[in-house]
Amino acid sequence: MIKVYNTLNKKKEEFIPLTPGEVKMYVCGPTVYNFFHIGNGRTFIVFDTIRRYFEYRGFKVDFVQNFTDIDDKMIKKANEEGTTVKKIGDTYIKEYYQDADALNIERATVNPRATEFIGEIIKFVKGLVDKGYAYEVDGDVYFSTKKFEGYGKLSGQNIEDLQSGARISVDERKKDPMDFAIWKAQKPGEPAWNSPWGMGRPGWHIECSCMAKKLLGETIDIHAGGSDLKFPHHENEIAQSEALTGEPFARYWLHSAFVNVNNEKMSKSLNNFFTAREILERYDADVIRFLMLSAHYRQQLNFSEDLLESAKASVERIYNAIGNLENLIDEVSREEMNEEEKAYLESLNKYKEKYIEKMDDDFNTADAITAIFDLIKDTNTNITIDSSKELAQKALELIRELGAPLGMFQKSTKGNLEEEIEALIAKRQQARKDRDFTLADKIRDELKDRGIVLEDTPQGVRWKMI
């Protein structure tokens, strides 16, 4: 039984899909006017992992993640660069895919662009106007929040107490400060489409509601995104969607927490961000994913070079274990398991059970990773050159099986690990000959951090995994 923390009801709930065995999931994607930063990257990695885990547990997942390709920021960027909004969108959608692929983020079932749904959006807006939930002023159309009885139920805020916030534009023409634009009249130099209210373009909130309804249906299983979208974006999506259809918009709302730098949220507005591409130039995707999944997705995560280095060492330790098993598969002479090995392999299932228990509990990736470390500690100790090829192969398959939903530990290290370790041992031996004991100790400690212990014997230096 999978339990998820539902932001809407402020508690963990058993996940029961609308259709048995299927998950309809919508995740708010990027506004494509720049490279995405690693804070956005955490959101994409988290919900990619959740999608993968549902699939691992046997669900068919319809996974929709949109591109916002018409927006104030995009218009500003296009004007600055003397190009069109469409060209900006085309460019950064391509760049998104390049970075997301590099982070081993699986492609969505559909990545809709808002501009591909203008006709549907106009119908959606008209439906709200016809029902009395929206009103037109000088070509702009606003949603009347006071008309929707449940406004504020996601964020837990009372509409009477809400004030115009930083992300809510103040406009004297609105009937209430909390009303928000679902259609915007054209301004000079802006792209626009013909509508019953004149030339204009959609508001941000209406885009996601419309695309989710069109691609997944009036009610979906999961709507997800970063916690900064909870209000007003997701609150507004609920209001306009449920006002139009009269049905619940999403049964479960999931929100990933911020990535912080120096205890402040990473954001482009604070100019304290690192793009995913910048980090990918220096660290492998497994390292970045490991860091992003090393804390529960609802916990804020601090980002620093030290934490990246720590994640790198942890990933190397797991790949060392993988490499050790790959080498054993090539080197051991006995093919099949004996009865004792079959019993030992069966005992390894406790790590899989622990992993599933933790992931079933609101996708606790941090504890799931701990279960993988416990597994490799066991295999490092008990699978040796005297073991069978079959046992080493089965253990390797189990490590990869548990790594797959996390999007990690799938690469082969064949030939690389042993050569790298032997080279470091040779370097250490030379340092000792040169009486550079500081360097020799540093190499020994570096190997130990990676789970490799050196033993000085009369026959020379030997190494083993721990």
UniProtKB/Swiss-Prot annotation:
Protein EC: 6.1.1.16
Keyword check for Protein biosynthesis: yes
A GO molecular function held by the record: cysteine-tRNA ligase activity
Cofactor remark: Binds 1 zinc ion per subunit.
Organism: Clostridium perfringens (strain ATCC 13124 / DSM 756 / JCM 1290 / NCIMB 6125 / NCTC 8237 / Type A)
Name of protein: Cysteine--tRNA ligase
Principal location listed in the UniProt entry: cytoplasm
A GO biological-process term: cysteinyl-tRNA aminoacylation
Coiled coil: none
Catalytic activity: tRNA(Cys) + L-cysteine + ATP = L-cysteinyl-tRNA(Cys) + AMP + diphosphate
Domain of life: Bacteria
Extent of motif 'HIGH' region: 30-40
Cofactors named for this entry: Zn(2+)
GO cellular component assignments: cytosol
Keywords annotated in UniProt: Aminoacyl-tRNA synthetase, ATP-binding, Cytoplasm, Ligase, Metal-binding, Nucleotide-binding, Protein biosynthesis, Zinc
Binding-site residues, ATP: K268
SMART domains from the UniProt entry: DALR_2
Residue interval(s) of motif 'KMSKS' region: 265-269
Enzyme class: ligase
Short name of any one Pfam family annotated for the protein: CysS_C
Binding site for Zn(2+): C28, C208, H233, E237
Self-association and partners: Monomer.
Lipid biosynthesis recorded as keyword: no
Location in or out of the cell: Cytoplasm
InterPro entries, per the entry: Cys-tRNA-ligase, Cys-tRNA-synt_Ia_DALR, Cys-tRNA/MSH_ligase, CysS_C, Rossmann-like_a/b/a_fold, tRNA-synt_1_cat_dom, tRNAsynth_Ia_anticodon-bd
